[in-house]
């Protein structure tokens, strides 16, 4: 069993006694110090000997003595020597006060105070809050074993290795305190060792963790996210550190605290604790956890939890703005050393795109670093994080202008699971800044659909191919070989195909909803709409009602489209895939081209004819089969079929039939007028040609001469041909008696009729 040392070794923890070396013992005994006293911004030593060393650390002054400091600090020894050499001109150099400035000392005045207390032989209380700063200060002051045995570097290293790294909570607190100690904490491997310790404990079996961590709400452990102070004395330190049991029960463990009597913590017990870390330290922890082989879905859940704390805009209901209750503000207030990264994500809902970018210009570097770091550590496996989280992260990355390579990688990950997306997450504004830009980034959605199709094709190819690089199967039973039987392989391929079709259908519905939403934008060009609508294959949509709704919305928002553009727009949908309600709406839609309306009506007529044919065939088959008398009666006529349809169908069909009858009446009227005009032309031609072979009149002879010269006769013949082409459309109905018969038609008219009909056809 290994557990927090604050409870098992509380009497020895944190108390650093006077050094065991004899080099400075006589100086410490002569000083007769009673401790340090602070006055305003200065520290003094309670001693009978006057101070001869002034150390300035920032804006704090320390009035000390030379010999206790130079006996344990190599850097202090050199600094005092250089200061004394500068005062050689004075008569009594030994009595002069040496002034040493250490403005760049890691840990600041607090760490130097502890180092000075240690140099004077006072007991120093080591805690998880001050150990990292004191370790860096000891390295800065060069308090090595060469100066004195058991020096400060040795003791702080021992405390880190045997106390801090064995405790979960202390490792978190020390790593949090390292935020203000760069690059010293990095160079001394404190960050690496704490990250690996946290990763090792996070990957351990949860059954070895007692239910006593901050995520479960420890009672007296202090503020959540702050370091736990570990003081010497009894075992009542009150820390929130979890206890760990890696092999059976320990000797000092009570029955009440045995793992069998404790509830097993969930797999996400460590999410809340690591979420207080700064982004660079969180990346180090997650990287170490990946190396140790944790499940990618748990890693993705931890990243999502961390991002929801530091980037409130990534949650569905939270606004894209920081408040005073954000976790980074709590962490900086309860943590050690400051260094908390304050985030401010500005939403684009309150102003224009330029205002958003201007508001993000000041903290954009820190925000961009957080977003890019989260993108880089997100597991690449499918379903490691939700598609909604990826889309919201993509929105922030575009708004903050993250690295293009990371944005492209994030788009590919979204495309891998695009069928899981929601319309609200897909409506990403366009942050181009130009007035002609569309309200939403349509090009981004086009790229997401392309990534989705590429992923689908890759999965289909992998599922259908048997593996070219595999060795030939050995001559043994099939269940011993690593290959899948042909039947199983075919079943897997069919399952992959079915899943791909279902995913494409969901993406098609999502895309139709997206098109209906963005079609209201007047700046959306017809080309972009058409390309996005045709990005999916035809097999992805079983019904084009959603696409028709988007087309109708686009026509409503763009009333200035030409007839050619309307026809081009309507080509994106298939009239044969429209439902009955959509067909009835399209038949009465004045915004659609007339040709599309006719095509819709014809398609519906074909459907009705096919239904009648199938009903008749079913009736004949049922009548010929045995027991046909018991079969229900099937509709045999169109009237019977319409009587069995809903009332909405009958009303819509009646309106459409009324329009068709009106068109037929107008066509019959035009036929009658044409036949009347044709009769008058025949009568005029008879007058010109003469009757019964008599001598033509002078006027008729003149007209015949003009016909021979090809002057006015050509005009008559050209007019005749034009009218003949018009008669070509209705000649069959006129011949059948559907039109109005020409009044007074004689034998000559009947004789010349076939000739004129042939001319009209030619």
Swiss-Prot record:
Name its GO BP terms in alphabetical order.
protein ubiquitination
Residue ranges of region Disordered? 1-29, 227-264, 460-495, 687-718, 731-762
Q: In which pathway does it act?
A: Protein modification; protein ubiquitination
Listed Gly residues bias regions: 227-238, 736-747
Q: Which Pfam families match?
A: NPH3
Q: Which UniProt keywords apply?
A: Coiled coil, Ubl conjugation pathway
Superkingdom of the source? Eukaryota
> Which portions of the chain have biased composition (kind: Basic residues)?
752-762
Q: Where is the composition biased (Low complexity)?
A: 696-709
Q: Which PROSITE patterns match?
A: NPH3
Compositional bias of type Basic and acidic residues: which residue ranges? 1-12
* Ranges for domain BTB: 51-128
Where would one find coiled-coil regions in this protein?
Answer: 654-691
Domain NPH3, by residue range, is: 268-607
Annotated PANTHER family: OS12G0117600 PROTEIN
> Which family, according to UniProt?
Belongs to the NPH3 family.
What's in the domain note?
The BTB/POZ domain mediates the interaction with some component of ubiquitin ligase complexes.
The record's function comment reads: May act as a substrate-specific adapter of an E3 ubiquitin-protein ligase complex (CUL3-RBX1-BTB) which mediates the ubiquitination and subsequent proteasomal degradation of target proteins. Plays a role as signal transduction component in coleoptile phototropism and lateral translocation of auxin.
Descriptive protein name: Coleoptile phototropism protein 1
Query: What is the phylogenetic placement of the source species in the record?
Result: Eukaryota, Viridiplantae, Streptophyta, Embryophyta, Tracheophyta
Gene encoding this polypeptide?
Answer: CPT1
